[in-house]
Amino acid sequence: MLTSHVDQIKGVKLKSSHSLYSDFFNFSHQSSAYFLFQQGVECYEGRKGGRVHYAPQKTPLGTVNLVFIDPLCQGADLPELLSEFDASQCVPNLYVCVSSRVAKPLRQRGYAINQIGAESKITLANFHVHGKKKKQLRHASHFGERNNCTVKELPWSEVDEAQVKDVSLAWLRSKGVNNRELRYATRPPVYGDEWQVRKFYCFHEGKVIAYVFFDPYFEDGKILGYCANILRARPEKACNGALDYTILEALKVFQDEGVPELSLGVAPFSNIQSDPDERPAIRVFSQFFYDYGSYFYACKGLAYHKSRYRPIETPWYLCSKDIGLVRLYWALLFGLKVAGGREI
């Protein structure tokens, strides 16, 4: 069963300027656009409008600007906005996890273009769990019946904060990220209500055992889809399947509302293909990290989980210019918090 409290969640008071939210409603076509709402993010505003959100990252070889989402702007204004932004900065700009929409004009500006991973999307109108290839999802869809669990969409005031945080701590400790919350290429969970974010919780005997937070993205003032950004579940064997069950129950709600698509996010370094304008060393390192970097991030496991939904995969890109490899990877690994000290 699933209970919805959409009206309460959508009534959260806005905390930022009207113009930013207006741009977000019109130009946040990329599923990761909501990642701009986190600490350490700066904004460049173009002369004709449009915004480039970025995070300066210090390295021993100098600062690097991490541009981690597509700019918010009209498509026709994008090349000029990127040119303005590059000219305004005195340090290199490193575009991370941007779409082909951004990679194309950067290619024309002399940037090296490397695939960084594949985003997975589901068209909700025709999604189902029938057939041999979705056997695991079909099994997960009955998790609630087998284990007496329910999924509810709730405002924060109706959730036990301690239970939710306990799920996060248990989940993080079971992963190979040394208790770090990654940022920019994703965003850490916010324990509270957030503007337009949908939060679904899986309960067993009144206790939270899993939850999924869905970030919205828009185009021309209309909801384009939701991104399953934060997925957490207790690591006990009895909870296996709770995350997929939560996603599938939320998916039913989105289908009933007529939401066009659901993004499962990007699988870092997955299905990387060569590019005529790439830096070959970056592709080699990316493949090596995908194959052997599970201590830092479980790339293979994440890619496999997404593949079970039989999604449409689209490459995202890393675009670099005038930056050495050591400086580049230092900015990436420490800026995104793939590497670094413990936090929790």
Identify the residue ranges that each predicted region occupies.
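A conserved beta-strand-loop-helix scaffold within acyl/acetyltransferase catalytic domains
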Residues: 6-67, 96-114, 125-139, 146-282, ...
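Glycine-rich phosphate-binding "P-loop"
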Residues: 65-76
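Short active-site oxyanion
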Residues: 90-94
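A short acidic, glycine-rich active-site loop
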Residues: 286-296
